[in-house]
């Protein structure tokens, strides 16, 4: 990617589940990562089918994943609490209450291009999630002051 490029090739992996999912993504990116400018993955079930360990988070970075999104299962592995505040590629649902650790959006710069990433979760059977519509709209407007490129995982 460079500042004169008019298109950005983004690949987004849906819910990566357990070791088979991690291996599939690792092997795919080892062969095809040069075809994409930015790689996003939903990783909330990547560690043994539930949650995300810090080791697997770091493995995904090594595989070439630029941004990671998640949902309610991110909390299934308790070690998430020891690293989520420093996990600069991880985006938890933005419509969780403000006191929930982690961040619901971030801007990630790669090769001179700033890309906004927002994550949201639905409310059905998700007790602590706030309505996402106003929150997401406001966040998109905030990010668009910095970059026109915004990826939304819902």
Q: Predicted regions: what is each one?
A:
Residues 1-154:
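Acidic, metal/ion-coordinating pockets
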